[in-house]
From Swiss-Prot:
Keyword Secreted belongs to the record: yes
Protein name (record): Alpha-amylase-related protein
Residues where chloride binds: 206, 308, 343
Gene3D superfamilies xrefs: Glycosidases, Golgi alpha-mannosidase II
Pyrrolidone carboxylic acid modification, residue list: 21
Length: 494
């Protein structure tokens, strides 16, 4: 009986721990993470204070923080080739990182770090020098900055069969030296690295290449981490939020279900299907059942996104900033529909897969600059600063904890729906106008369409809609309108 009680206690403790790792630890009614891809720490700190917090964003995913290899031309992916756990990268040093985390936490913006637990850097001719000046010999699996030696890695082999679990989890992903996470020593180094970031005030981690590590090894590592730092405003006993990169198209030998109890999982099917729909390859009317009926994970387990830093560079259905009208519509739907833990992308311009972030002649990352409307220039795209996107972050906050109802569609690519009696969204992806009296479910009054304008001093700078006592309003979205979406909510009542 004592053994049974102990086993039950341990089981319940494990279940409680994994549930806690699904909690993003957001402030108040905030809901949305933004990935400020390749931004410098000092620029993120300022963005938290001057833009993200005032507009209700919840958190920032930052690029990898630990020292990486220096690759010719400085492609973005060099950040994913670590050679030590020193906190010095092109984004800044440890002092600048700690300052950024503190300043962002102080204004209610949580920081989530993209972490590399699967591997170290790939082969490099001779001695490699990292962003903190550390030397390594990747071809010999020698990384003195940790230190790691060959005994800390799986034997070298190539992934040639993606249906072979051994190859997927113990061979080298695109030649990157594959760490042995079953080793007590390797585990201790990874836990030490993550705990240091927790001490500095981060709220959690995006775990890169999670499917290439055995779930039982990750369970041990996650379970060994410290609680979040109460000095940064986290409650006592709060656990780090974990979201794991697991690419699973539904026929993978290593499946997302092996990881979704440990933390959230990146729902790549969401990205692919929303791209197909808003590119016109699937009618929007079918989105009424969006979510688990489409084979997606449970809402609380799914980290959702229109695109990410990887798949935005691929050919195919995934939308990116280069199709702005469809991208804004897809993002509006993403943030209005009650499914998933939402993340939006903030990119830099690229012409090919390897394009580096905007940099000067000395290959230093440059700070984003803004025009008079606050939109980024000088090579940064900053989708999160597009009015149609940051306004929908405000919409998502306004309608939090409300149900979707009042769905309408024209049998094709015009749709609308309500969120409780607090918000209304309409989308037109047809080649003809949407002009219709629709039920907005809102209290009577005049509302500002937050995608076309802003409510300033009681006046709307864009479209406005008058809602009658029955909740109906006349909705017009022209086929050639700049935006194919219209959004109303109670916090934008004129």
């Amino acid at each position: 009986m004592i053994k049974f009680a102990l086993a039950l206690t341990l089981c319940l403790a494990g279940a409680s721990l994994s549930l806690a790792q699904h909690n993003p630890q957001w402030w108040g009614n905030r809901n949305t993470i933004v990935h400020l891809f390749e931004w410098k720490w000092s620029d993120i700190a300022e963005e938290c204070e001057t833009f993200l917090a005032p507009r209700g964003f919840a958190g920032v995913q930052v690029s990898p923080v630990n020292e990486n290899i220096i690759s010719s031309g400085r492609p973005w992916w060099e950040r994913y080739q670590p050679i030590s756990y020193k906190l010095t990268t092109r984004s800044g040093n440890e002092e600048e990182f700690a300052d950024m985390v503190r300043r962002c936490n102080d204004v209610g913006i949580r920081i989530y770090v993209d972490v590399l637990l699967n591997h170290m850097s790939g082969d490099f001719d001779g001695v490699a020098v990292g962003t903190a000046g550390t030397e390594a010999e990747p071809s010999k699996k020698s990384f003195p900055g940790v230190p790691y030696t060959a005994q800390d890695f799986h034997p070298s082999c190539e992934i040639t069969d993606w249906n072979d679990r051994f190859q997927v989890q113990e061979c080298e992903l695109v030649g990157l030296k594959d760490l042995n996470q079953h080793s007590d020593y390797v585990r201790s180094k990874l836990i030490e690295f993550l705990d240091h970031l927790i001490e500095l005030g981060v709220a959690g981690f995006r775990v890169d290449a999670a499917k290439h590590m055995a779930s039982e090894d990750l369970e041990y590592i996650y379970g060994s981490l410290s609680n979040l730092n109460i000095d940064h405003g986290f409650p006592h006993n709060a656990r780090p939020f974990i979201f794991q990169e697991v690419i699973d198209h539904g026929h993978e030998t290593v499946s997302r279900e092996e990881y979704n109890e440990l933390g959230a999982v990146t729902e790549f099917r969401f990205s692919e299907e929303i791209g197909k729909a808003f590119r016109g390859n699937n009618a929007l009317k079918w989105l009424q059942s969006w979510g688990t009926d489409w084979g997606f994970l449970k809402s609380e387990q799914a980290l959702t996104f229109v695109d990410n830093h990887d798949n935005q560079r691929d050919q195919g259905a995934v939308l990116n900033y280069k199709s702005p009208r469809q991208y804004k519509m897809a993002t509006a739907f993403h943030l209005a529909y009650p499914y998933g833990i939402s993340r939006v992308m903030s990119s830099f311009a690229f012409d090919d897969h390897d394009t580096p972030p905007p940099q000067d002649a000395q290959e230093n990352i440059i700070s984003p600059e803004f025009d008079e409307d606050g939109v980024c220039v000088n090579g940064w795209i900053c989708e999160h600063r597009w009015r149609q996107i940051y306004a929908m972050v405000g919409f998502k906050n306004a309608v939090r904890d409300t149900e979707l109802h009042g769905w309408w569609d024209n049998g094709d690519n015009q749709i609308s729906f309500c969120r409780g009696n607090k918000g209304f969204l309409a989308v037109n992806n047809n080649l003809y106008d949407l002009s219709q009296e629709l039920n907005t479910c809102l209290p009577a009054g005049e509302y500002c369409d937050v995608t076309s304008g802003s409510l300033i001093d009681g006046a709307c700078t864009g479209k406005s809609v008058t809602v009658n006592e029955h909740g109906y309003g006349y909705i017009h979205i022209g086929s050639d309108d700049f935006d194919g979406v219209l959004a109303l909510h109670v916090n934008a009542k004129v």
